[in-house]
Amino acid sequence: MDAQRGHTTTILMFPWLGYGHLSAFLELAKSLSRRNFHIYFCSTSVNLDAIKPKLPSSSSSDSIQLVELCLPSSPDQLPPHLHTTNALPPHLMPTLHQAFSMAAQHFAAILHTLAPHLLIYDSFQPWAPQLASSLNIPAINFNTTGASVLTRMLHATHYPSSKFPISEFVLHDYWKAMYSAAGGAVTKKDHKIGETLANCLHASCSVILINSFRELEEKYMDYLSVLLNKKVVPVGPLVYEPNQDGEDEGYSSIKNWLDKKEPSSTVFVSFGSEYFPSKEEMEEIAHGLEASEVHFIWVVRFPQGDNTSAIEDALPKGFLERVGERGMVVKGWAPQAKILKHWSTGGFVSHCGWNSVMESMMFGVPIIGVPMHLDQPFNAGLAEEAGVGVEAKRDPDGKIQRDEVAKLIKEVVVEKTREDVRKKAREMSEILRSKGEEKMDEMVAAISLFLKI
């Protein structure tokens, strides 16, 4: 690891171990490197290996230097290949959070050795800005979620007895009943996460970066700035722009299948890298896809270490035979951005993780939301409010309804009843693409002013 590099401004970027966080941080790192900042990108070995194929091949790649974070290794800790949230069995998530916190001492050594001009950190490590402050290194929080859910959480923390001042966006009946008025926190675990997020936001030095854009969340960003007494700078949507002809494991067969379909005739189905639908949820989604009569690609994931599960066992009996060439089911992983960008993709059945919402908007693909937990119901509601998606309503017991899934897929992809959603999704994509790198100007100006460069 090099010490500070001459007169070049150096930035150490330190995301949480989730793939969506890594992806957004990497796209921000690329943008900063194109603006002549030298980037140190710090994560675990398994995560660094995953992002290497997405590093730029041009000379600017020298401006992004990967730095390994070593998590503690002991019999009661996770092995290195599980130092990521990607396909991590859910019961091991608390262990990963604990190991990440225990890496603070090693991160302090990295900070001391590199002595960057600035630390840009994520929202699950309040100890990172504290360590930076002890070395007189300024630190800025980059939040990879939306401003809307952050403002709800912070408002509930600051003013628990006061009504949220912004008109409520869409939140369907089941989620309204489930989430309490306290910013959506319903368990001790959720309260703990909320406290950690709030601490990371408040520790940021006068500026907050957020992976969003004003056309979508301006009113929430303005209120977030008031709550934090900090400048909120949108830098999104930060989305990986794939080369459609580039090599990706398994993509050639997917592309060949997609190339045979009519324009905007296919739905992509995925629930992210950290959520594994139950057997009952899988059956409802499968029956919904079958009844919709729409072409589909469905990515089915199992937790790491689950070598016994077969796709056939996770789906209704005879499902694959009945859908035939109309559907493709992929086990494990598929290049989401490439599939969404393909001209035959006309809808996205999504859990509404924030990165997936941003990708849908960038590529102009309308969303059929099937949120599962955390911030996802709020993200689905925001997409619906913006007119670029619709959410599949659950029954009063919170169960996914196959008829609702089938109906919305047909409406969004095929029928005239949702032409407005398709049109709005295309318009949103055009707005975002017309901005280009303009979204980074405010950020670079804020950083330059902050660092007096």
Swiss-Prot record:
The keyword Transferase applies. Its EC number is 2.4.1.-. It comes from the Eukaryota. One of its GO terms (biological process) is carbohydrate derivative biosynthetic process. The active site is at 21 (proton acceptor), 122 (charge relay). CDD domains: GT1_Gtf-like. Keywords: Transferase. UDP-alpha-D-glucose binds at residues 273, 336, 354-356, 359, 375-376. It catalyses: mogroside IIE + UDP-alpha-D-glucose = mogroside IIIX + UDP + H(+); mogroside III + UDP-alpha-D-glucose = mogroside IV + UDP + H(+); mogroside III + UDP-alpha-D-glucose = siamenoside I + UDP + H(+); mogroside IV + UDP-alpha-D-glucose = mogroside V + UDP + H(+). Signal peptide: none annotated. Highly expressed in mature fruits. SUPFAM superfamilies: UDP-Glycosyltransferase/glycogen phosphorylase. It is an enzyme of class 2 (transferase). Pathway: Secondary metabolite biosynthesis; terpenoid biosynthesis. The keyword Transferase applies. Mogrosides, the major active constituents of S.grosvenorii fruits, are a mixture of cucurbitane-type triterpenoid glycosides that have been proven to be powerful and zero-caloric sweeteners and can hence be used as a sucrose substitute for diabetic and obese patients. Belongs to the UDP-glycosyltransferase family. UDP-glycosyltransferase involved in the biosynthesis of cucurbitacin and mogroside tetracyclic triterpene natural products (e.g. siamenoside I and mogrosides IV, V and VI). Cucurbitacins have cytotoxic properties and exhibit deterrent taste as a defense barrier against herbivores. Mogrosides are nonsugar highly oxygenated compounds used as high-intensity zero-calorie sweeteners; they also possess pharmacological properties such as regulating immunity, lowering blood sugar and lipid levels, protecting the liver, and acting as antioxidants and antitumor agents. PANTHER family: GLYCOSYLTRANSFERASE. This is Mogroside IIIx synthase. The lineage of its organism: Eukaryota, Viridiplantae, Streptophyta, Embryophyta, Tracheophyta.
